[in-house]
């Protein structure tokens, strides 16, 4: 099964990893470690909460107004 991962640099160093399909999130000292941790966390999540088959994920962007 192929899922999505969003990796974001953490303020304190390392990376935060998020899987949008399940909502699982974790962190790691490197992008590779964060992704490995996300894989493990997501596998554990899916043992309890299997995904319902869907048409896939649509990743897009949107803008918000900037506030001063």
Where are these regions (language model features)?
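Short, charged, surface-exposed hinge/linker loops at domain edges
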Residues: 1-4, 32, 36-68
């Amino acid at each position: 099964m192929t899922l999505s991962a969003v990796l974001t640099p953490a303020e304190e160093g390392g990376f935060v990893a998020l899987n949008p399909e399940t909502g699982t999130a974790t962190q790691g000292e490197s992008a590779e470690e964060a992704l490995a941790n996300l894989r493990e966390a997501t596998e554990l999540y899916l043992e309890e909460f299997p995904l319902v088959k869907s048409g896939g994920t649509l990743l897009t962007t949107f803008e918000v107004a900037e506030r001063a």
